[in-house]
Amino acid sequence: MKKKNIYSIRKLGVGIASVTLGTLLISGGVTPAANAAQHDEAQQNAFYQVLNMPNLNADQRNGFIQSLKDDPSQSANVLGEAQKLNDSQAPKADAQQNNFNKDQQSAFYEILNMPNLNEAQRNGFIQSLKDDPSQSTNVLGEAKKLNESQAPKADNNFNKEQQNAFYEILNMPNLNEEQRNGFIQSLKDDPSQSANLLSEAKKLNESQAPKADNKFNKEQQNAFYEILHLPNLNEEQRNGFIQSLKDDPSVSKEILAEAKKLNDAQAPKEEDNKKPGKEDGNKPGKEDGNKPGKEDNKKPGKEDGNKPGKEDNNKPGKEDGNKPGKEDNNKPGKEDGNKPGKEDGNKPGKEDGNGVHVVKPGDTVNDIAKANGTTADKIAADNKLADKNMIKPGQELVVDKKQPANHADANKAQALPETGEENPFIGTTVFGGLSLALGAALLAGRRREL
């Protein structure tokens, strides 16, 4: 029995050993294939992660996978090394910013400096730029719209008066940038002073306006015209007064007064002009008008008027002697002696007898025309004056004189000397002489009878 049991035990041991050996043999023959097909969970995870690491190149990825295959027990270590290398090769955020295209960079900078975006809005737009740089222009446009819509409205704080002042000051052309900004800041600081600030701005704008030569006021224009026609100013003086008018039109009256004073001071003296007039006008007038009158009127009157001819002498004498005497001695004397004397003495050469007038200081064309019985336009036309007010002392003007009616009658009388109508006094004298002769004949006849 004992032997039988021992045999059985031995037989069982051999069987177990055989089975074990077979198992070992079988296991040793299929190990590489089983390892490749049946990775444990750690190996599988490591394999999957290494395949999806974006920053590994192909050689690096294949090397890590081969290491996992070679020694699955080192899967955790291999995976750790792969992750480190992947992280070290990952692109930095700053580097990405530096690689933005030009539009993206510009948009990024502008959005960062938009004052009316809050932090969340700004970060949202920047993230959109990072996600899709090709949309930089659109993202920037949206950011600008939002920034403008959230800007504080300046007009909401201005009242109507302030708004008007603000607008007017902005459009004042003669203020410089600093002045304009100063007034606008004052408007913002105190809107209640809008009217006063606007008034000050207007004054400053007007004071700095360029002076326009063609915008003379009426007073300035008058002074300008008169100074141009002052005959005794030289060119330099005239230009000086005109420049003063341009510089300050408000003192036009004072400038004109100074110009007139200087013009009068430089006028030619009248002493030289009066002497010929006195000699020509007064002395000849007295000699021609008084002496001949006395001789012609009084002597024949005395001879004729006592005995025979009271009737003939007095009546005709009064009519013929006095009236003609007055006409001949006084009127012609005044005309020939006094008027020409005044004209020759006071206004030198107003008329020299040949229809020529010599201009004296103070003369105007209108005055000359009135004195000579013509018109200013006629004088201007005859002398080809461009401006009838532009005449100078000493200038000779042709005057087409129209004589008064009494002169015309005198001329007619002078044109008929044969009839005795030239001078009524001559007719009276002849008549008186005949009367005397007749009286003398009668007187002689009576004496003979006696």
UniProtKB/Swiss-Prot annotation:
<feature type="domain" description="LysM">
    <location>
        <begin position="355"/>
        <end position="399"/>
    </location>
</feature>
<dbReference type="Pfam" id="PF04650">
    <property type="entry name" value="YSIRK_signal"/>
</dbReference>
<dbReference type="InterPro" id="IPR005877">
    <property type="entry name" value="YSIRK_signal_dom"/>
</dbReference>
<feature type="repeat" description="2-1">
    <location>
        <begin position="268"/>
        <end position="275"/>
    </location>
</feature>
<feature type="repeat" description="Immunoglobulin-binding region B/C">
    <location>
        <begin position="212"/>
        <end position="269"/>
    </location>
</feature>
<keyword id="KW-0572">Peptidoglycan-anchor</keyword>
<feature type="short sequence motif" description="LPXTG sorting signal">
    <location>
        <begin position="416"/>
        <end position="420"/>
    </location>
</feature>
<dbReference type="InterPro" id="IPR009063">
    <property type="entry name" value="Ig/albumin-bd_sf"/>
</dbReference>
<protein>
    <recommendedName>
        <fullName>Immunoglobulin G-binding protein A</fullName>
    </recommendedName>
</protein>
<dbReference type="Pfam" id="PF03373">
    <property type="entry name" value="Octapeptide"/>
</dbReference>
<dbReference type="GO" id="GO:0019864">
    <property type="term" value="F:IgG binding"/>
</dbReference>
<dbReference type="InterPro" id="IPR003132">
    <property type="entry name" value="Protein_A_Ig-bd"/>
</dbReference>
<keyword id="KW-0732">Signal</keyword>
<dbReference type="Pfam" id="PF00746">
    <property type="entry name" value="Gram_pos_anchor"/>
</dbReference>
<feature type="modified residue" description="Pentaglycyl murein peptidoglycan amidated threonine">
    <location>
        <position position="419"/>
    </location>
</feature>
<comment type="function">
    <text>Plays a role in the inhibition of the host innate and adaptive immune responses. Possesses five immunoglobulin-binding domains that capture both the fragment crystallizable region (Fc region) and the Fab region (part of Ig that identifies antigen) of immunoglobulins. In turn, Staphylococcus aureus is protected from phagocytic killing via inhibition of Ig Fc region. In addition, the host elicited B-cell response is prevented due to a decrease of antibody-secreting cell proliferation that enter the bone marrow, thereby decreasing long-term antibody production.</text>
</comment>
<keyword id="KW-0677">Repeat</keyword>
<keyword id="KW-0964">Secreted</keyword>
<feature type="compositionally biased region" description="Basic and acidic residues">
    <location>
        <begin position="260"/>
        <end position="354"/>
    </location>
</feature>
<feature type="signal peptide">
    <location>
        <begin position="1"/>
        <end position="36"/>
    </location>
</feature>
<feature type="repeat" description="2-11">
    <location>
        <begin position="348"/>
        <end position="355"/>
    </location>
</feature>
<feature type="region of interest" description="Disordered">
    <location>
        <begin position="401"/>
        <end position="421"/>
    </location>
</feature>
<keyword id="KW-0134">Cell wall</keyword>
<feature type="region of interest" description="12 X 8 AA approximate tandem repeats">
    <location>
        <begin position="268"/>
        <end position="355"/>
    </location>
</feature>
<dbReference type="GO" id="GO:0005576">
    <property type="term" value="C:extracellular region"/>
</dbReference>
<feature type="repeat" description="2-10">
    <location>
        <begin position="340"/>
        <end position="347"/>
    </location>
</feature>
<feature type="repeat" description="2-2">
    <location>
        <begin position="276"/>
        <end position="283"/>
    </location>
</feature>
<feature type="repeat" description="2-6">
    <location>
        <begin position="308"/>
        <end position="315"/>
    </location>
</feature>
<keyword id="KW-0390">IgG-binding protein</keyword>
<dbReference type="InterPro" id="IPR019931">
    <property type="entry name" value="LPXTG_anchor"/>
</dbReference>
<feature type="repeat" description="2-4">
    <location>
        <begin position="292"/>
        <end position="299"/>
    </location>
</feature>
<feature type="region of interest" description="Disordered">
    <location>
        <begin position="260"/>
        <end position="365"/>
    </location>
</feature>
<feature type="repeat" description="2-9">
    <location>
        <begin position="332"/>
        <end position="339"/>
    </location>
</feature>
<feature type="repeat" description="2-5">
    <location>
        <begin position="300"/>
        <end position="307"/>
    </location>
</feature>
<feature type="repeat" description="2-7">
    <location>
        <begin position="316"/>
        <end position="323"/>
    </location>
</feature>
<feature type="repeat" description="Immunoglobulin-binding region D">
    <location>
        <begin position="93"/>
        <end position="153"/>
    </location>
</feature>
<dbReference type="InterPro" id="IPR036779">
    <property type="entry name" value="LysM_dom_sf"/>
</dbReference>
<feature type="propeptide" description="Removed by sortase">
    <location>
        <begin position="420"/>
        <end position="450"/>
    </location>
</feature>
<dbReference type="Pfam" id="PF02216">
    <property type="entry name" value="B"/>
</dbReference>
<comment type="subunit">
    <text>Interacts with host TNFRSF1A; this interaction leads to the stimulation of both surface expression and shedding of TNFRSF1A.</text>
</comment>
<comment type="similarity">
    <text>Belongs to the immunoglobulin-binding protein SpA family.</text>
</comment>
<dbReference type="InterPro" id="IPR005038">
    <property type="entry name" value="Octapeptide"/>
</dbReference>
